[in-house]
Amino acid sequence: MSDVSHPRPVAPGVLGADSAHDDGGRIAKTGQTATTSRLAVARVTDAPVMPFGEQVFQRLLRHRVIFLGTQVDEDLANRICAELVLLAAEDSERDISIYINSPGGSVYAGLAIYDMMQYVPNDVATYAMGMAASMGQFLLCAGTTGKRYALPHAQVLMHQPSGGIGGTASDITIQAEQMLYVKHTLAERIAMHTGQSVEQIETDSDRDRWFTAEEAKDYGFVDHVIRSATEVPSEGPVS
């Protein structure tokens, strides 16, 4: 009687490094298949996932909407300036909308955004929601005349710039002169956008001054108080 050897059974679901025979005598390289599968899973698992909030902002950017919803700093300014340049390059005629809910922040970062808003050929519509304070107020009124909006419960805060000063007596003098220069520059820009006099702006911004949406409209920070997106003309916030 001839000796017949039987292949060792492979436990279901177990993939080893050894080769196994199929019914046709072909060799199935199960170890290689398992390695390939694991690598494929690893590639999918290790792929960076964009945070949900960032995904929303990126989708809004496709509709030419920029959100300024944090304190104004250098990183935010660089991002918004880049987005303005990108949207202008894609279409130099369609409006760009900036929604503002910000407590303010760095004067120089804000001035970078301001200059870029004036630099691009597009009309830049601004929308105040929540709070547009300090540099947020400055950027709000810098929108294209006739396209500056406030939602009903938005609050606007205007005040003079502030900052710490230190060092030698000579350094303190230089820093104080620079702060006065910045204060006057901001007052001139706000006066130009609101129709108020520079003297009036400097007087009103000497201390914190709050405005309701309607008061902001009367003062010249915005042109319209809106309660619904339907009140915005066709070239509106999301086109």
Regions found by a protein language model. Give the residues of each.
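N-terminal organellar transit peptides
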Residues: 1-135, 141-239
